[in-house]
Amino acid sequence: DLNNLNLKEVDKDTVFFIAVHGFGGEDGQVQDLLSKKGYRFTGSDYESTKKCWDKVLSKEILIQNNINTPKFITIDKHENLNLNDEFFSEITEYFVKPAKNGSSLGVSRVTNLNDLESAVNDAKKFSDQVIIEECYGDAEYTVAILNGIALEPLEILPDPKQSFYDYKAKYLSGETKKVEIIDKALAEELKAMAIKAFYSHDCNTWGRVDFVTKGESIAVLEINTVPGFTEKSLVPLAAKKSGINYQQLITEIIEDVL
């Protein structure tokens, strides 16, 4: 709770390691607070973090920079779903998600238009704006960024009992796997796209760029400025596969602030 964050007795030379998941950390609130108080902190600043948290704004930035991202439309909280929109005649499978939220909460995969309204209503519980996105339902990849370098890309193999890499597959399942990518050309393409996407949002130091595929098409799904940071999380795992242990990773992130 940021309201309980008492900074009066904190030395001005203190460096804050930002690892707050969800609201407060991933939406830029804690970064904004620390900046205004004159404290240094790890990772991206308030503006960059806010851009990545807002999926609609982030997609607009990606499109402006000629970076592929799944086609989408938006629906505001009090707006009704219009199935006559041309979008629904072009695309037949969708992901419905809150425009501002994380951890795949409120996200649904929809294969039948009859289920779309229910999915939109679920997403509205988490955000005032909802995205209906073209389903890129094939492979999922992720690339961690550390001090301007793309680390070893990973392929995410969700629990087969889940229809996609949802909250259960991320946090509750023991069957989700993260594996190295054998195709080196693909790995290099993902690295290049990740760097371009990361810096198109003016991000800094470290983060993670997630990808989805549909056939031969690779698209940026989202950019995470405060990704999970347990030893089993994707960024530490990518670092380990790149020859950087957990303690070294922490040190490199902090040293970039000093």
Model regions and ranges:
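Conserved metal-phosphate-binding beta-hairpin within the catalytic cores
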Residues: 134, 143, 198-231, 239
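Active-site nucleotide/adenylate-binding loops and adjacent lid/helix of ATP-dependent enzymes
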Residues: 9-10, 51-133, 137-139
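A glycine- and small-aliphatic-rich helix-loop capping segment at beta-alpha/alpha-beta transitions
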Residues: 32-41, 112-117, 242
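Phosphate-binding site of ATP-dependent enzymes
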Residues: 111-189, 213, 218-219
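Hydrophobic beta-strand scaffold residues
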Residues: 40-41, 69, 94, 246
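ATP-binding N-terminal substructure of ATP-dependent carboxylate-amine bond-forming enzymes
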Residues: 1-47, 51-53, 57, 76-84, ...
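Active-site "cap" helix and flanking loop/linker of ATP-utilizing ligase/carboxylase catalytic domains
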Residues: 155-207, 237-258
